[in-house]
Regions:
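Surface-exposed cleft-lining segments at the edges of enzyme active sites
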Residues: 79, 90-106
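Short helix/loop segment immediately N-terminal to the Walker
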Residues: 84-86, 90, 120, 124-125
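Active-site-adjacent alpha-helix immediately C-terminal to a catalytic or transition-state-stabilizing loop
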Residues: 21-22, 35, 103, 107-172
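Phosphate-coordination/substrate-recognition cap region in phosphate-metabolizing enzymes
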Residues: 2-85, 89, 141-165
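A generic short-segment signal for beta-strand/edge and adjacent turn/coil regions
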Residues: 9, 28-29, 96-98, 129-135
C-alpha cells in the first residue's frame, strides 16, 4: 500500500514487543529501507493480559469459560486476573503493571501519541506505526472520537494496513 500510493514515510514507531518489531522489519524490507530510526515504545505495547499472558485462546476458554474470556477480551474497563510473580513471562515485563483493561491501555497510549506522534502529524509528516489490536483501538478511539461502547466491538484484523489521512487542524479526511 505504501509503495502503491508512493508514500514517503518520515517516522517509524512500534511497540517493544517482538511481533510488532518483526512486522515493522518486514515492512522496512519491502520498502527497501535499512537505515532508518525506529522509535520503540512500551506505551504502544499490547494490552497486558495478566495471568492470561502466553495462554492460547482455547486453553484459556477451557480454564475460565468462554463467557468470562470474552468479558476480559472485549470489555472496556475489566482487567483479567493479575500476573502472578511466578509467571514464566513476569521477568520479561519491565513495568509494575500486572494486568490491564482497554481503559488502562488508553491511559498510556494517548499521552505517548500526544507527545511523540501528534506533533509530527501536525508538521505534515507521514508516520508508520506497527503495533497491536488494543493499542490500535486506543488510538482509533482518540482520533475518531469513538465511544467506549463502540470501540470494544471493533475487529482489527492482524496484518492489515490502516491508512489515516489528516487535514488541517488534524481533522481526519
Amino acid at each position: 500500500l505504501i509503495n502503491e500510493l508512493n508514500i514517503e514515510v518520515d517516522a517509524y514507531f512500534t511497540s517493544q514487543l517482538e511481533r510488532a518489531i518483526n512486522t515493522l522489519n518486514i515492512i522496512l524490507k519491502i520498502l527497501h529501507k535499512s537505515n532508518v530510526t525506529i522509535n520503540k515504545a512500551w506505551e504502544l505495547n499490547e494490552r497486558h493480559y495478566g495471568e492470561l499472558t502466553g495462554l492460547n485462546k482455547d486453553d484459556t476458554i477451557k480454564k475460565y469459560g468462554e463467557k468470562q474470556v470474552q468479558i476480559w477480551r472485549r470489555s472496556f474497563d475489566t482487567r483479567p486476573p493479575p500476573m502472578d510473580k511466578q509467571h514464566p513471562y513476569r521477568d520479561k515485563i519491565k513495568s509494575n503493571i500486572l494486568s490491564e483493561s482497554l481503559k488502562d491501555t488508553i491511559k498510556r497510549v494517548i499521552p505517548y501519541y500526544e507527545k511523540k506522534i501528534k506533533p509530527l502529524i501536525s508538521a505534515k509528516k507521514n508516520i508508520l506505526i506497527a503495533f497491536h489490536g488494543n493499542s490500535c483501538r486506543a488510538l482509533l478511539m482518540e482520533i475518531f472520537n469513538i465511544s467506549k461502547e463502540k470501540i470494544v466491538q471493533f475487529e482489527i484484523p492482524t496484518g492489515n494496513p490502516l491508512l489515516i489521512q489528516f487535514g488541517d487542524n488534524l481533522k481526519v479526511q
